[in-house]
């Protein structure tokens, strides 16, 4: 565990431009720029390691988003692990406090059953007669536990005009209540939404997910490539207070079935080492890939490392003509 944590700290600090002379990022890897606004996600299942990494790289991190509150048996639920991460971060950053957001997702758990990205719960809580109550509940939850902001990560709205109308009305209410309570608001946006037909209000930070070019249900490939990033920037450039979310790690595709399994960067590197293969860096994306055979079945792996993320961030900077805010999924 100690070795794993050290590797994670070193990789993130290199990514953020915080490596000392003894631990420089690879040659040609543009570090994340000084002065970049950088938010990192911490997931509730990685509490202890996340706190260690964030604490070691605290001077490079602008904000933290704790993933996540969700719906359990019809009510908002905040995992104890998320609460403990918040307490630990507050203890460690007492001399340098940074905003900590409560991330809220539309995952639903009922008994032993879990539905991820459930749109039915959204149709309920965003409906005209429940939207204000839902917004008040979110603000109360964030204030109760001492968060500095609320992050709305409601997904799979896709091109449903009625659901988007409800969401935007809810957002207006949330922004008003959050402002009264002294809370910040971040809105996470999937890359495929019909952004050109939607009128998002001022007051929130808008974060575009830039990491689902390939994944579960697709052919093997990187989470993003440079052309994908340029296209996303062009589509979303008109939004106010815009930033971009990048993700490390990747997927392992089983060629016979097409099934994909998510991998962290460390998992992918360990898999390559175990099968004695050397990953190759793709020029179009900066991502790493390799293939291996196990139990007579061919597998293909694509994943992003710190050099990949730095390249993606630099491409977005070039599109914007400035250093853009970046969020990273996730500290692992």
Q: For the regions a protein language model found, what residue spans apply to each?
A:
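Substrate-binding surface in catalytic domains of secreted glycosidases
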Residues: 41-43, 73-81, 160, 164-274
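Hydrophobic faces of well-ordered beta-strands that scaffold small-molecule active sites
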Residues: 38-42, 62-66, 100-104, 150-152, ...
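Catalytic domains of carbohydrate-active enzymes, especially glycoside hydrolases
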Residues: 48-74, 138-150, 312-327
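C-terminal motif of bacterial Sec signal peptides marking the signal peptidase cleavage site
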Residues: 16-18
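Glycan-recognition patch characteristic of GH18 chitinases/ENGases
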Residues: 23-134
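Active-site groove signature of glycoside hydrolases
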Residues: 134-165, 206-212
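An active-site-proximal structural segment forming one wall of the substrate-binding cleft
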Residues: 123-150, 177, 190-192, 196-199
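Glycan-binding loop/region signatures in secreted carbohydrate-active enzymes
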Residues: 109-121, 248-312
């Amino acid at each position: 565990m100690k070795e794993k944590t050290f590797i994670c700290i070193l990789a993130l600090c290199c990514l953020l431009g915080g490596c000392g002379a003894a631990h420089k990022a690879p040659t040609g890897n543009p570090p994340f720029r000084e002065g970049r606004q950088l938010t990192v996600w911490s997931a509730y299942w990685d509490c202890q390691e996340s706190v260690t990494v964030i604490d070691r790289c605290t001077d490079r991190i602008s904000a933290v988003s704790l993933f996540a509150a969700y719906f359990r048996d019809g009510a908002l639920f905040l995992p104890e692990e998320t609460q403990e991460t918040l307490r630990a971060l507050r203890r460690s950053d007492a001399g340098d406090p940074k905003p900590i957001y409560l991330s809220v997702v539309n995952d639903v758990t009922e008994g032993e059953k879990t539905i991820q990205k459930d749109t039915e719960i959204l149709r309920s809580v965003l409906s005209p007669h429940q939207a204000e109550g839902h917004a008040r509940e979110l603000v109360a939850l964030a204030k109760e536990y001492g968060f500095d902001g609320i992050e709305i990560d409601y997904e799979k709205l896709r091109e449903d005009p009625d659901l988007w109308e409800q969401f935007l009305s809810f957002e207006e209410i949330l922004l008003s209540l959050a402002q009264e309570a002294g809370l910040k608001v971040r809105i996470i946006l999937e890359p495929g939404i019909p952004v050109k037909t939607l009128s998002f209000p001022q007051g929130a930070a808008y974060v575009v997910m830039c990491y689902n070019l390939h994944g579960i249900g697709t052919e093997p490939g990187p989470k993003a490539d440079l052309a994908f990033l340029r296209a996303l920037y062009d589509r979303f450039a008109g939004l106010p207070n815009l930033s971009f979310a990048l993700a490390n790690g990747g997927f392992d595709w089983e060629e016979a079935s097409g099934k994909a399994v998510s991998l962290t960067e460390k998992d992918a590197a360990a898999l390559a080492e175990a099968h004695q293969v050397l990953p190759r860096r793709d020029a179009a994306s900066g991502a790493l890939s390799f293939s291996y055979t196990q139990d007579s079945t061919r597998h293909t792996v694509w994943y992003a490392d710190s050099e990949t993320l730095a390249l993606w961030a630099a491409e977005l900077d070039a599109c914007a003509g400035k250093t853009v805010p970046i969020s990273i999924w996730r500290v692992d």
